[in-house]
Amino acid sequence: MEIERKFLIKDLHSLPFSIEDYPHRELEQAYLCTGPVVRIRKDDEQYFLTYKSKGLMIREEYNLPLNRQAYLHLREKADGRIIQKTRYVIPLDEITDSFPSQKESRLSPQFKEKGVSLFLELDIFKGDLAPLFLAEIEFPDEETARSYQAPDWLGEDVTHLSLYHNSTLSQLK
């Protein structure tokens, strides 16, 4: 089960941190089908086939490993554009601890007591989708996702807009 919220970041300069301070990976993904979603992804030098059910904030997700040869074979059969992006992974606790003005983005105490740690996955799209910046936060459960108060710098919450699903972006003309 994947439970996530997605945000549209307008300007990387508005972020309260420097992305260069965090690790990143190069992603390439393509879609064999968009309803249901069947995706292939190259994540640095790892390869995956993913199935995602319908949904916006909550979806079933299954990942299967692929080898490079299988990935390249399936890539030739992809529909639409092949999406390329750089993904930065940023621990949200680190941001809220370092920037007192961001304290309002913290989880409520009952979630902190459960040991919930959240990570921001910031995608910087390349090619004809640039300059698009999307941030995703994956949550352990629906209650945590719904109660999370996003800081202003995350921008517009586009979780419920299918336009910002990568599967939709792959089909845009």
Where is each model-derived feature located?
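Phosphate-end processing signature that detects enzymes handling 5′-triphosphorylated RNA
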Residues: 1-173
